[in-house]
Design a protein with these regions (language model features):
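C-terminal tail/sorting-segment detector
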Residues: 388, 392, 396-418
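Extended, compositionally biased non-globular segments
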Residues: 182, 196-301
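Glycine-centered coil/turn sites that cap beta-strands in beta-rich domains
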Residues: 324-340, 344-364, 386-389
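A glycine-anchored, Pro-Gly-centered beta-turn/N-cap motif
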Residues: 152, 270, 383, 395-398
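Bacterial Sec-dependent N-terminal signal peptides
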Residues: 1-20
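Solvent-exposed N-terminal domain segments of exported/luminal and surface proteins
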Residues: 19-135, 142
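Extracellular-facing segments of soluble proteins and assemblies that are Gly/Ser/Thr-biased and enriched
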Residues: 99-183, 188-191
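A recurrent domain-boundary module in secreted/ectodomain proteins
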Residues: 111, 278-326
Length: 418
């Protein structure tokens, strides 16, 4: 029977029985080790809770990487005790789109809020010619392109330099989620929206206007003299104000919201997604992350202090855990370790180690070869991992754990006794 099972497993595919943690749950950097960030504040995501319709992100707003100092900025990062709500089935907003207002409009996967490009200041306070925060506030950014607002609200307006490593050879990963539920990716994606054509840098469709003065808006609107912007100069160079830019259809790869619908590794059937935009040299390019409006229907209870009240039954998400080895210890072999406890009821820990970076597939099958659940299906760095398998919805019996990485397969039996 075992020989027959081993022969059948590579060819078995029963999608209706397969389950995997969706990216809106698995993408978050959950703090499972007590790591702290600035001033000893607990870093990254504290807890992820979810219902059928929403994911709730509990976070401090402080990352685990080093932040600060902030020149010419009297504020310091503080624990914000955020609870953000991310819709799990995002919907396109029909009619008038919702503006990306001042303050947090989205959240990175480590719990740091995302702000739009707009500075709070406009020329002569007339609500036209708004300063571009990336230029106007640049002196106060730390080495990770972030800074704290009044009240200690640390945030970024642009490419989160310290959150990920740029790699132009592969599709960027999910870096965060917008409050309309659509994911935010790094700057690299498939050349074609159907997933073909190789990898390319996603180019913004915004460009600097060809103007010699600031008397009109993009689209041709003529302003009253009292609404004119300052003369273009070294003090106020072209690009210092948001109105210095215009959207040009098909100028780049992305739409007016700075996103597109396309297949991605996490969403193989396609998803609308925003993209971080940078130049060929890595410099942030307008509108940087998201533009003036959201694409989808927004969970507006995220606005204000950012402490959403949960009014529905929720479960707490248990993530796949990277196991920190002892000092000097490195994974030298590919190995699937025996689960613990075994037998188990209802859950057990499955651990494994990777000697090299690999695409990992970790699945559970019943003894007939039917796929029951997908626990892991993504690229992982070399190291030690453990994942919790919950068999609450399964009958007592023997199940097969199968892991495949770097063209190598290992299997083991586990026993559920209720």
């Amino acid at each position: 029977m075992k020989l027959l099972l081993l022969l059948l497993l590579p060819f078995i595919c029963v999608p209706s029985f397969a389950q995997t943690d969706p990216p809106e749950l698995s993408s978050w950097m959950i703090n499972t080790t007590g790591v702290t960030g600035y001033n000893g504040i607990s870093a990254n995501i504290q807890k992820v809770q979810y219902s059928t319709g929403n994911v709730y992100i509990n976070c401090t707003g402080v990352p685990s990487f080093t932040i600060g100092p902030w020149q010419a900025n009297p504020n310091t990062a503080q624990d914000q005790k955020y609870v953000f709500r991310i819709p799990r089935s995002p919907k396109i907003k029909t009619g008038t789109k919702t503006a990306t207002r001042l303050g947090h409009i989205a959240v990175w996967k480590n719990g740091v809020p995302i702000y739009n490009p707009k500075d709070a200041f406009s020329y002569n306070s007339l609500n036209v010619w708004f300063q571009d925060a990336v230029l106007a506030e640049a002196i106060s950014f730390d080495g990770c392109y972030g800074h704290p607002a009044p009240g200690g609200r640390y945030h970024t307006h642009q490419n989160p330099k310290c959150l990920y490593t740029l790699d132009s050879s592969k599709h960027s990963g999910v870096l965060g989620y917008s409050f309309d539920g659509f994911p935010i990716y790094g700057p690299f994606g498939y050349k074609n929206s159907d997933g073909t054509g190789g990898i390319t840098r996603m180019k913004t469709s915004y460009k600097l206007r060809v103007i010699s003065d600031r008397t009109t808006l993009a689209g041709g609107t003529t302003l009253q003299p009292n609404q004119y912007g300052p003369t273009i100069s070294t003090t106020y160079p072209l690009g210092f104000y948001l109105e210095d830019y215009e959207f040009a259809q098909s100028y780049g790869d992305l739409d007016v919201y700075n996103g597109r619908f396309a297949k991605t590794p996490e969403y193989p059937n396609g998803i609308y997604a925003y993209h971080v935009t940078i130049s060929s040299t890595g410099k942030s390019e307008f509108p940087y992350i998201m533009a003036a409006n959201y694409y989808g229907e927004v969970a507006e209870d995220n606005f204000g202090p950012g402490r959403v009240t949960i009014t529905e039954p929720v479960s707490t998400y248990t993530p796949l855990t990277f196991v920190t080895p002892s000092i000097g210890e490195v994974a030298t072999i590919f190995e699937l370790n025996q689960n613990y406890p075994n037998p188990f009821n209802p859950s057990t820990i499955i651990s494994y180690q990777l000697p090299i970076n690999s695409f990992v597939s970790l699945k559970i099958y019943d003894v007939l070869g039917k796929e029951i659940k997908t626990l892991v299906n993504k690229n992982q760095d070399a190291g030690y991992y453990k994942v919790d398998f919950d068999g609450s919805n399964l009958q007592s019996g023997v199940y097969i754990v199968r892991i495949e990485a770097d063209k190598t397969v290992q299997e083991m039996k586990i026993t559920l006794i209720k």
